[in-house]
UniProtKB/Swiss-Prot annotation:
Record field: catalytic activity: L-seryl-[protein] + ATP = 3-O-(5'-adenylyl)-L-seryl-[protein] + diphosphate; L-threonyl-[protein] + ATP = 3-O-(5'-adenylyl)-L-threonyl-[protein] + diphosphate; L-tyrosyl-[protein] + ATP = O-(5'-adenylyl)-L-tyrosyl-[protein] + diphosphate; L-histidyl-[protein] + UTP = N(tele)-(5'-uridylyl)-L-histidyl-[protein] + diphosphate
UniProt family annotation: Belongs to the SELO family.
Name of the protein: Protein nucleotidyltransferase YdiU
Obligatory cofactor(s): Mg(2+); Mn(2+)
EC number(s) on file: 2.7.7.-, 2.7.7.108
Function: Nucleotidyltransferase involved in the post-translational modification of proteins. It can catalyze the addition of adenosine monophosphate (AMP) or uridine monophosphate (UMP) to a protein, resulting in modifications known as AMPylation and UMPylation.
Chain residues that bind ATP: G90, G92, R93, K113, D125, G126, R176, R183, D277
Keywords: ATP-binding, Magnesium, Manganese, Metal-binding, Nucleotide-binding, Nucleotidyltransferase, Transferase
Name of one Pfam family that matches: SelO
Taxonomic lineage from the root: Bacteria, Pseudomonadati, Pseudomonadota, Gammaproteobacteria, Vibrionales
Residues forming the catalytic site: D267
Protein source organism: Photobacterium profundum (strain SS9)
Positions with a binding annotation for Mg(2+): N268, D277
Length: 514
């Protein structure tokens, strides 16, 4: 493990032309201190997590000391927000400090959120507050623990600097780590400002650093100089195809775990299919497909059940921005593959949650009838699947079924519809080759528990951690970090974090304010 000063920076993005961003020096926070560090993320960077406690670390990531090797940059991008194009976007409260290169040649962006004003801050103060920073810190750990691609947060730092929001709050910084911070909006910016040469340059950059397998062999690269324009376009079509696939896989993951992003603007969409920008996000408590986690989303544009279609809308916006590089007919053909990838990945995830190995056509009926059941009974989505993970094939037999149904008593107001669905589920399980044997069924249940988490970041838990942190107690942040980093494990000492939310906990309203 390395010390902070031993990290190797290779800042490729800052070497791009100045139209891609503006060099900015972070503005200092007063009396900074460490709130929490994520050891898993530190390990990704080959950084000793104990470094986070040093004054060098704390000062370097709160604008009080320049970190050697970094080249702070506010990235310029635009995007569609709630369906409307906004040309005045960019890093308004954060800076790309640089890119850390590990011993395995993995490259990680280091981004400082809450670093102060930039040319893209508009009327904002460029700051982040402790409240929203805690949510992103824990939210990214939760998605990563669930096996869904996301940005990461290395550490969270607090200060005595006061920031004006609905009330005066403590300023904070979050050290965000990601494979890339490139958004759909980066390409939209270059397209709508008619910088087509730079658009091609950015596409080439993305392919070189993140999709190198799309590149041809060295000899074929030399032949590119004489290739026809249409031949040259093929690699950009392959790039868009990859982005469509990654986005579809991401949305399948979100829908399977009940995650609602809340503000799926194109400037919040990662070209690498990462969960990006944790604002008013939320996880389903009771299963409600119409769930709106952002109280500013009056029309429900970004409701939970709208996420698959919105992702395609966003991909269409990206595809349009790439038309200087890809024929429109090719863009349309690539976009048409989205639903197939989404359905394939989502169905696979749902079969895993139900302990089904074989793919059968009637599975869609089993899925839809289950969702109708959960919605009609307002059943807790996560607790249902976790409980189901302890129900063996034998438990579903005629003689054992009544006892099995009792395990769901706390989740259902009426168990008759549940009994009907469980009988259909038992029939479906009978088609699985290994459930007839005890060992095979035990293995199935073990696998189910690896796909049905015991712990998710419920809004009320995040709020409790925030309330304690604002009083100077960061214990709950670290406790939640522990269970969310491995949410499929039992963590018996933290059973209370797996409970159904209290009534007030289901009614929390989350805004974009950060």
């Amino acid at each position: 493990m390395k010390t902070l000063s031993q990290l190797v920076f290779n800042n490729t993005y800052s070497e791009l032309p100045t139209t891609f961003g503006t060099a900015v020096i972070p503005q200092p926070l007063s009396d900074p201190f460490l709130v929490s560090v994520n050891p898993q993320v530190a390990e990704m960077l080959e950084l000793d997590p104990l470094e986070a406690k040093t004054r060098l670390f704390i000062n370097s990531f709160t604008g009080n000391k320049e970190l050697a090797g970094t080249a702070p940059l506010a990235m310029k991008y635009t995007g569609h927000q709630f369906g409307h194009y906004n040309p005045d976007l960019g890093d308004g409260r954060g800076l790309l400090l640089g890119e850390v290169l590990t011993s395995t040649n993995a490259k990680w962006d280091i981004h400082l959120k809450g670093s102060g004003k930039t040319p893209y801050s508009r009327q904002g103060d460029g700051r982040a507050v402790l409240r929203s920073s805690i949510r992103e810190y824990l939210g990214s750990a939760a998605l990563n623990g669930l096996g869904i691609k996301t940005t990461h947060a290395l550490a969270l730092l607090g200060s005595t600097t006061l920031v004006s929001r609905e009330k005066m709050e403590r300023g904070a910084t979050l050290i965000r780590v990601a494979e890339s911070h490139l958004r759909f909006g980066h390409f939209e910016y270059l397209f709508y400002t008619h910088q087509h040469s730079e658009l091609k340059l950015l596409a080439d950059y993305l392919i070189k650093h993140h999709f190198p397998d799309l590149l041809t062999t060295e000899s074929e690269q030399e032949d590119k100089q004489t290739a026809s324009p249409n031949q040259h376009h093929n690699i950009y079509a392959s790039m868009l195809t990859r982005i469509v696939e990654l986005t579809a896989q991401l949305i399948a993951g979100w829908q399977s775990v009940g995650f609602a992003h809340g503000v799926m603007n194109t400037d919040n969409m990662s070209v690498l299919g990462l969960t990006f920008d944790y604002g008013p996000f939320g996880f389903l408590d009771d299963y409600n497909p119409d769930y709106i986690c952002n109280h500013s989303d009056y029309s429900g544009r970004y409701a939970f059940n709208q996420q698959p279609s919105i992702a395609l809308w966003n991909l269409s916006a990206l595809g349009y921005a790439l038309t200087p590089l890809i024929d429109k007919e090719d863009v349309d053909a690539i976009l048409n593959r989205y639903h197939l990838t989404l359905q394939r990945d989502y169905s696979a995830r749902m079969r895993n949650k139900l302990g089904l190995i074989e793919k059968r056509e009637e599975d869609t009926v089993l899925f839809s009838s289950l969702f109708e059941l959960l919605q009609s009974q307002m059943v807790d989505y996560t607790l249902f699947f976790r409980t189901l993970s302890s129900i063996s094939a034998t438990d579903l037999s005629v003689t054992s079924l009544p006892n099995s149904i009792e395990r769901f008593d706390d989740l259902f107001t009426c168990t008759q519809p549940l009994e009907k669905w469980l009988k259909a589920y038992a029939v479906r399980l009978s088609f699985e080759n290994d459930t007839s044997e005890k060992n095979g069924d035990t293995l199935r249940l073990t696998q189910m528990k690896l796909h049905n988490p015991k712990y998710i970041l419920r809004n009320y838990l995040a709020q409790q951690a925030i309330d304690k942190a604002e009083d100077g107690d960061f214990t709950m942040i670290d406790e939640l970090l522990q269970v969310l980093s491995s949410p499929f494990d039992e963590h018996l000492e933290f059973n209370q974090f797996a409970d159904k939310p209290p009534y007030w906990g289901k009614k929390l309203e989350i805004s974009c304010s950060s």
